[in-house]
């Protein structure tokens, strides 16, 4: 099974992937690691700030990794904010039945109430530079992601009152 975890920055994609690794022993790939490897090795002229260009660039690689893992009957978790909302259009039904997708979304209320906690826990798994992160940016991105998930009928986890994700939702029968 392939599990795709998407969401805005700071929603907990990487820590969720780590917890799933520990629970199910599925390896995970952080799209951020792929991005930085390609940038640092000079295999692209894109920078970490070229989000609009990075989505199609990275997705063209990631979707083929997904296909390869499925063809090899391997389990894999892939997490990152560079998964386009129309990702499912790149796979036929034989692939789609082996892919589970979920987007992590924080509500406006959660962000406003817990912004300092979001900053505090930002580096639990990876080191981050938090100087440029604003509450307004997080609210806008999460609202956009919620709208897109609804538009495409994608599964999402809404983080509203407290940050609690039941990882058992990732059992095969619970996600589409």
Name the predicted role of every residue range.
Residues 53-98, 102-106:
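Glycine-rich phosphate-binding loop used to anchor ATP phosphates in small-molecule kinases
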Residues 143-176:
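NTP-dependent small-molecule kinase module
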